[in-house]
UniProtKB/Swiss-Prot annotation:
The gene is HBB2. It comes from Naja naja. The lineage of its organism: Eukaryota, Metazoa, Chordata, Craniata, Vertebrata. Belongs to the globin family. GO terms for biological process: hydrogen peroxide catabolic process. CDD domains: Hb-beta-like (cd08925). GO terms for molecular function: haptoglobin binding; heme binding; metal ion binding; organic acid binding; oxygen binding; oxygen carrier activity; peroxidase activity. SUPFAM superfamilies: Globin-like. Keywords: Heme, Iron, Metal-binding, Oxygen transport, Transport. Heterotetramer of two alpha chains and two beta chains. This is Hemoglobin subunit beta-2.
């Protein structure tokens, strides 16, 4: 994947302002609200009975932070995202049996959350750059499935 200097700048400049624990929790919680079948991977997290329970669940919040922290690794390795996520791809395929479509869903929810948190700063160019990034990350995570 080729990244232009502008794309890299847009991504890194917005990411520097992202509250990873908050955005991670919001993203994972909203994904489970919007796509309830994804909750089956997190049944051991306790109360997932509705939007308030999901978004306030400490385990959802902690895992959301972990997911977004991992996503942040992609920014450090934009030219080698596949290798960066090779072990996570294996884990999600071999042990967790996650449908790779869920990676795309999570990426799309992240875009929505970022847009909501950053308003006018989340310009069409920034949106396009992040959409490209979440697609690259989703593809890298699905790599082991191919």
């Amino acid at each position: 994947v080729h990244w232009s200097a502008e794309e890299k700048q847009l991504i890194t400049s917005l990411w520097a302002k992202v509250d990873v624990p908050e955005v991670g929790a919001a993203t994972l919680g909203k994904m489970m609200v919007m796509y309830p079948w994804t909750q089956r991977f997190f049944a051991h997290f306790g109360n997932l009975s509705g939007p308030s329970a999901l978004c306030g669940n400490p385990q959802v919040r902690a895992h959301g932070k972990k997911v977004l922290t991992s996503f942040g690794e992609a920014l450090k390795h934009l030219d080698n995202v596949k290798e960066t996520f090779a072990k996570l791809s294996e884990l999600h395929f071999d042990k967790l049996h996650v449908d790779p479509e869920n990676f795309k869903l999570l990426g799309n929810v992240l875009i929505i959350v970022l847009a909501g948190h950053h308003g006018k700063e989340f310009t069409p160019s920034t949106h396009a750059s992040f959409q490209k990034l979440v697609n690259v990350v989703a593809h890298a995570l699905a790599r082991r499935y191919h």
